A protein has these predicted regions:
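Short alpha-helical functional segments enriched in proximate histidine and acidic residues
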Residues: 124
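Non-catalytic, conserved peripheral segments adjacent to functional cores
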Residues: 1-113, 129-131
Length: 135
């Protein structure tokens, strides 16, 4: 547990679910989407090289699976800012005890959840609503 995040492991080593904590009052709320110090304090060791934003118009759309081969593999922080998705990560790390296994999680703005995906995983999602915005 860190200040603005509740980070929990999954059955796949290195893959984590991040629940963001919102601080609010009568004006609205504030939530931190990313903080390298808090992730490192929770044991995250891989740098996040980039953040991408997508908009998917139609419910039922599948994006993925995306994967980068060494030496271009990268860690990802995947967040749904609008709508809802079923997000999946597949362990493709050679020699991993969970090689070939997958984990899925519903991500939405309402549940304030993200997936923290280490290098060596494929990633994709299916939109469960129209007008999904991912970060």
């Amino acid at each position: 547990m860190s200040g603005r995040f509740d980070i929990k492991g999954t059955p796949l080593e290195g893959l984590s679910v991040v629940r963001r904590k919102r601080m609010g009052d009568e004006r609205g709320w504030l939530e931190r989407l990313f903080c390298s110090e808090e992730l490192e304090a929770a044991g995250w060791i891989w740098p996040i090289a980039q953040l991408n934003r997508t908009l998917t118009a139609k419910r039922g759309t599948i994006r993925g699976m995306h994967f980068q081969h060494p030496p271009h593999e990268e860690a990802k922080l995947v967040t749904c800012l609008r709508g809802e998705v079923f997000d999946v990560a597949v362990d493709l790390r050679p020699g991993s005890p969970t090689y070939g296994r997958w984990y899925g999680e519903r991500l939405s703005n309402d549940n304030a959840s993200s997936l923290l995906i280490p290098p060596g995983f494929a990633h994709g999602f299916q939109t469960l609503t129209d007008d999904v915005e991912m970060f």
